[in-house]
């Protein structure tokens, strides 16, 4: 049995000039995930379920657990003195860690994705993304350090809190998964070099919003539902409503996750920096693809911290199909 800590140290040789800082950073995220796991499991007992009454910068009501997870992860990262600052879906602006100007990494995160599902005991997750800063080491970080395209990511991953808690991450050398053993307090390697199955057969989208979708997406949904034995259609529809949970299932079983633009969200709803980029990085490392319907997600240069984007991620052939439909059936 190999633990996450042992695995990370073992893989340090894959990085030239490795100093151990990235290893320590991933260890800090691991610690934050353990704390969140513990408190999610007793959330109904300690009054951290439900809405907090506050709104985040996007105008969304923050759940108590959103804020809790944000603070715990932030504290775990700051305590190691290896992160110069963070950007979070739950923070209006970047958070600069005083005294950590010497650090060369920044972290972007969605502390608790799908938190509205907590009250009904549905899987939720944590998403994280790691970049090397672009401003000089020794100075405070600025927004410039965070507004980098996804192809500059050093590492990315997620933690899914479900029937078991699992941490999945990549440093650009494959995707690896670790299951948390609460009796030992460690994450143990369960899958190495994960890949999407050759052919996907599941599509994940909130079909309740069908009438609001672009024409190309509507046509693609109909394509998924049509019978065609040569392409193993119809595909199966599965939608949990938690990006981490939907992505994780599709990674294991094969499929595509879709979150297109709508009239009320013309740029899409998912955040480029906190959700799209890390998941796109993982998808490509696992042999999949991620797109906004026209452009590779990892090539998009972000303009603002909380920028949104349409998002299609999963098996490469399925993402290519939806891109084709969007191109062939544009909105008037």
UniProtKB/Swiss-Prot annotation:
Annotated metabolic or biological route of this protein = Carbohydrate biosynthesis; gluconeogenesis
Enumerate the residues binding Mg(2+) 2: 110, 113, 275
Q: Which UniProt keywords apply?
A: Carbohydrate metabolism, Cytoplasm, Hydrolase, Magnesium, Metal-binding
Q: Give the species this sequence originates from.
A: Escherichia coli O157:H7
Q: Which InterPro entries match?
A: FBPase_C_dom, FBPase_class-1, FBPase_N, FBPtase, Fructose_bisphosphatase_AS
Q: Where does substrate bind?
A: 113-116, 206, 239, 257-259, 269
Q: Where is the signal peptide?
A: none
Its EC number is 3.1.3.11
Query: What GO cellular component entries does it have?
Result: cytosol
Q: Where in the cell is it found?
A: Cytoplasm
User: Which GO molecular function entries does the Swiss-Prot or TrEMBL record give?
Assistant: fructose 1,6-bisphosphate 1-phosphatase activity; magnesium ion binding
Pfam assignment, any one: FBPase_C
Q: Any idea what this protein is called?
A: Fructose-1,6-bisphosphatase class 1
**What is the enzyme's class at the highest EC level?**
hydrolase
> Which cofactors must be present for this protein to function?
Mg(2+)
- Lineage, top-rank taxon, reads Bacteria
């Amino acid at each position: 049995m190999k633990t996450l800590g042992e695995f990370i140290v073992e893989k340090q040789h894959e990085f030239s000039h490795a100093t151990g800082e990235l290893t320590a950073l991933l260890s800090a995220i691991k610690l934050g995930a353990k704390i969140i796991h513990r408190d999610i499991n007793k959330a109904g007992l300690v009054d951290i379920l439900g809405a907090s009454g506050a709104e985040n910068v996007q105008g969304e009501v923050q759940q108590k657990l959103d804020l809790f997870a944000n603070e715990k992860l932030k504290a775990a990262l700051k305590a190691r003195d290896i992160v110069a600052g963070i950007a979070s879906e739950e923070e209006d602006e970047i958070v600069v860690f005083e005294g950590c100007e010497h650090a060369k990494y920044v972290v972007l995160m969605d502390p608790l994705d799908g938190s509205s599902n907590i009250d009904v005991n549905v899987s939720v997750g944590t998403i994280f993304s790691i970049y090397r800063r672009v401003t000089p080491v020794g100075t405070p970080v600025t927004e410039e350090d965070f507004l980098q395209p996804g192809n500059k990511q050093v590492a990315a991953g997620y933690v899914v809190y479900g029937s078991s808690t699992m941490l999945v991450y990549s440093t650009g050398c494959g995707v690896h998964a670790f299951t948390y053993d609460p009796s030992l307090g460690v994450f143990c390697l369960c899958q190495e070099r994960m890949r999407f199955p050759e052919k996907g057969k599941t599509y994940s989208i909130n079909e309740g919003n069908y009438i609001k979708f672009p024409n190309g997406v509507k046509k693609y949904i109909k394509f998924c539902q049509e019978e065609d034995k040569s392409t193993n259609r119809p595909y199966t529809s599965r939608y949990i409503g938690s990006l981490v949970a939907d992505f994780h299932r599709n990674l294991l079983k094969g499929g595509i996750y879709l979150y297109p633009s709508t009239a009320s969200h013309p740029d899409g709803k998912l955040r480029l920096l906190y959700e799209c980029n890390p998941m796109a990085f993982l998808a490509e490392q696992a042999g999949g693809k991620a797109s906004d319907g026209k452009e590779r997600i990892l090539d998009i240069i972000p303009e603002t911290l909380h920028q949104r984007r349409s998002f299609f991620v999963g098996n490469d052939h399925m993402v290519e199909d939806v891109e084709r439909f969007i191109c062939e059936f544009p909105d008037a």
